[in-house]
Amino acid sequence: MCGIVGIAGVMPVNQSIYDALTVLQHRGQDAAGIITIDANNCFRLRKANGLVSDVFEARHMQRLQGNMGIGHVRYPTAGSSSASEAQPFYVNSPYGITLAHNGNLTNAHELRKKLFEEKRRHINTTSDSEILLNIFASELDNFRHYPLEADNIFAAIAATNRLIRGAYACVAMIIGHGMVAFRDPNGIRPLVLGKRDIDENRTEYMVASESVALDTLGFDFLRDVAPGEAIYITEEGQLFTRQCADNPVSNPCLFEYVYFARPDSFIDKISVYSARVNMGTKLGEKIAREWEDLDIDVVIPIPETSCDIALEIARILGKPYRQGFVKNRYVGRTFIMPGQQLRRKSVRRKLNANRAEFRDKNVLLVDDSIVRGTTSEQIIEMAREAGAKKVYLASAAPEIRFPNVYGIDMPSATELIAHGREVDEIRQIIGADGLIFQDLNDLIDAVRAENPDIQQFECSVFNGVYVTKDVDQGYLDFLDTLRNDDAKAVQRQNEVENLEMHNEG
């Protein structure tokens, strides 16, 4: 999962992009990058592994000159976690193009082969984002005149959409032209558009993964970029938009609302906060029906995503809500941390139990989801160590039984605790006295209540239905060989830093 931002401004954008990336940091903590276009029409790039605050020092910010730029925060879902695979990526032909991408291409392997054999384009990393950039560049290269018209750029994006499959929200810059952004025909990954009027004659535009980035910088939210839609903002600040997909349909990722997005964001006209409150209502009602005989003394969230959900469950059940865990905010999210051993070590550094809320009580813990089960098992153990008599666990999401192929790092089915297991078996493994999951239909209803115009969601991790209709068991097996924890351990041992000559080190 990644976060992207792009600003076409009339004033220097380096600080604004930095600030936007800090509020999108929850979408990826592995690497960060910013690239701008300076007054000489040259790219200025800084990218490296680490948090936004670690990657960009004052000397880097001073070099990132220009009124137009894009930024990216990354967690690696395709390729390795080497600094050379941090984004944005760059190609020098045609014109000079740079691109940042959130998502995952499901036909990256065949596209890499096509680019080399047919287009003579070499891909130097294992990142599908570099492949996507080169596909787009190759399509732009079909137009031999300069400068390109908006029609030409939209035609290149339409051709790109026909070639690539999967999930993608992208922002790019083309030297001598401006900034472009586009979203996949299923709208799986989020992308929003905003503007800020500087004065009567000057307007700045911004695209980002979540609306909270617009809010932070004082941009007015215009709308979500539609599935299959492309945005083009010229160097002069003129805005063009066009539908560039043949059969666009809205299939936003349901897991965005459960886990990834910030609660103060709106995605596809849905308040993430309100959706989570609705999840709490649905799950609370199910608990009241199915666990009416349980003696629950207190409802405690596993912070932070589940806090709003747990508060609503407590209201439905008529039980006290307490903050039983204190969170160290300087430790990354555990299920998107590379490697199972790192995740296990991280949980106890991340959370500490407040014994006063657990001692001699039957506690209902609430989490947003259960992925590998690593966190759940250790937190239940911590609750017992803190003196809880019984520990029940409620998940705001249904059982995650299938790999994700659209940009979330949980692809290996064998690493999912719910894969091939029933609820009671999962309960025994994690050591809970009781375990309950949200029903998928209830989860969909909870989110869709905020925008009834959305007819369906991308729910593959719950039901195994992949909306791009190109994912088979062979592809899932291929991903497993690349992305399971053992494979990633080998990748980390073999990685060699390659910062690239144009990187502002």
Swiss-Prot record:
Short name of one Pfam family: GATase_6
Query: What does the record say about activity regulation?
Result: Inhibited by iodoacetamide and by the glutamine analogs chloroketone and DON.
GO MF term set: amidophosphoribosyltransferase activity; glycosyltransferase activity; guanosine tetraphosphate binding; identical protein binding; magnesium ion binding
| Cofactor(s) of this protein | Mg(2+)
Pathway(s) served: Purine metabolism; IMP biosynthesis via de novo pathway; N(1)-(5-phospho-D-ribosyl)glycinamide from 5-phospho-alpha-D-ribose 1-diphosphate: step 1/2
- Write out the GO biological process terms: 'de novo' IMP biosynthetic process; glutamine metabolic process; purine nucleobase biosynthetic process; purine nucleotide biosynthetic process
**Name of protein:** Amidophosphoribosyltransferase
Q: What species is this protein from?
A: Escherichia coli (strain K12)
Gene of origin?
purF
